[in-house]
Amino acid sequence: MKKIVLLAAVSAIGIAASGECHSSFSDGGEFSVGCNYWASHAGMYMWRNWDAKQVEKDLGKLAAHGMTILRVFPLWPDFQPITSEYGYCGTFRNYRQAGGPFLNPAGVDEKMMSRFRFLCDAAEKRGIRLVVGLITGWMSSRIFVPPALEKTNVLTDPDAIMWEVRFVRHFVRETKDHKAIAAWDLGNECDCMGDATASQMWNWIYAISSAIRLEDGTRPVVSGLHGVSTLASKKANARQQAELLDVMTTHPYPLWTPNCNIAPFDTMRNGCHAACETVLYADMTGKPAFAEEAGSMGPGISSEERAAASMRAALFSCWANGIGSYLWWCAFDQDRLDFAPYRWTGIERELGLFTSDGKAKPTAVALRDFRAFLGTLPFRTLPPRRKDAVVVLSETQDEWKKAQGAWLLARRAGIDISYALAEGETLPDAPLYILPACAGYGEYTREAFWRVMDRAKAGATVLVTQGNGAVLSNLRETTGLKVENHYRCGNEVGVTIDGVSFGVRESHVRKLTADGAKVLASDTSGNPALTVFNYGKGKVVYFNAAIEVNAQDTAWPVYRTAARAAGIRRLVEATGAVRTLGLTEHSAKDGATFVVAVNYAPEKMVYSVRVDGVVRRAWNGECADGKLTIGANDGCIIQLER
């Protein structure tokens, strides 16, 4: 009884409760695929231009292509059509429901609610679960709010928040008993609905999440926001999300994400994007996370065939990294719709898995085939992946570029990483810690920096990469390096490590001399580039460039050197010069190990590998005689025994 009372209290005050989460969103559950759904005939106007038969037909088509989860949107002004009346000189008089009397205190249109229940019934009949985006006030670059609130900032205006809370409570109360609903989403990218400080955004999220939990404490509250930052002062930040919400979401579109759309869509940088960002959000917050919106942004960015190929690699990556669900944006093309935002912007019109007349695109086929492939495996869920290193990020900066750069370098080096906030309550145990692309003059607090270095004293290895004018105190003490001169001057040099040569670009020159450190490699100017220093019982490996933020993926030998210094040895390792292979290792309770190998190259590849163990079986590829063969943008699962 005490536990029930406590959970009720936590739910009532709007703070995220710890505990079990729906398997679609957490590591260890069966992987779900799906999409974001607007009806094929009307898009966002599906509720006002209702066609029940078309909705049934749409959902049948989606279910036939293996989709078991949809994100759906009650368009806010259609469901809560409140209006305002004004008197002399524009003085506000009162609110009305669609210009008439209120039919319920929340001003909710019951005809729209009936249509939403029909959607729920149709989904349940087909085994589809729904993530419901409650405050759908922003969609595809257009604001959609009730007429009475059109000139307000709906994130900060007290009247707007009052009506939002009323709407959410009414909607959740009326639909919470439907079995098709898996989770409540705050809404679609609600941080795009108005300007707000981090504190104001906290208040808004608190109000909406509290309203949800007052009516339904049994389902998780999902973020749905557009980008979450490590930077504590950002509107939507990791600490705020962790405190208030149950499940994190990513919208990993390369076109809109820094350092992503700088390579072809069907290559490694973009193939890793969804898994990398989703793992980052989960690790930063300690909450489950899933890819809620993914997509190519249409045939103007990537052909339909290449989009499908990249999706296939992303699906394998997300599944291998313990991400519970992957949803594409969106179900159907919207190229025949003549209202805004489709009247405004061409890039939003051709994003569907299906054409507007219902023809399946290669992406729909790839989604179906991946889900079918998982069904052929002798296990329903994949054991958690092995993690070798912790990348330590800071709340003093927006760390996305560093996080992504570290992920790509680690993938190419053949190791697996997780993330942690330097200012967090705990620092996970690991043989290797990475302080990537240390920036500015005060990225890590004194306490955070020494907490990492204390791990080196105790026997771990710490990799520090530093460039672009950054200053770290105690550099000489912790790395065995002395700074002779450090000044702003464009600098391009070459480095060779273990026979692999690559270039680095920096905005500054940092001239170093070894003062206890061992120089493992110098750059082409003769300056120490890669060094190692014995520190306590452990080691500090240092590289004199910010390789993570500058998208210098060819510098992966730096990460391999640090992994070797930490004594990390994987069961399957790539041995060749080509590094477009991702490997994750998963130990089962019966002693077997499964290795998921993802080929991020847009062509079939035969990789040279070292295998420590006996290959008992391979699915969707071949692994024999030191060669691993995988199709273009595809994945292979290997079962090993030792």
Predicted segments, located by residue:
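Aromatic-Pro/Gly-enriched surface loop or interdomain linker
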Residues: 365-432, 589, 632
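Active-site mouth of glycoside hydrolases
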Residues: 25-245
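Sec-dependent N-terminal signal peptides
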Residues: 4-12
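Aromatic-rich peripheral "rim/lid" segments of glycoside hydrolase catalytic domains that contact
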Residues: 331-388, 405
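Glycoside hydrolase catalytic-domain groove-lining segments
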Residues: 199, 214, 218-225, 229-299, ...
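Substrate-binding cleft of secreted/luminal carbohydrate-active enzymes
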Residues: 294, 307-345
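Alpha-helical scaffolding within the catalytic cores
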Residues: 54-58, 166-172, 228-239, 271-281, ...
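A conserved amphipathic helix/loop scaffold
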Residues: 440-642
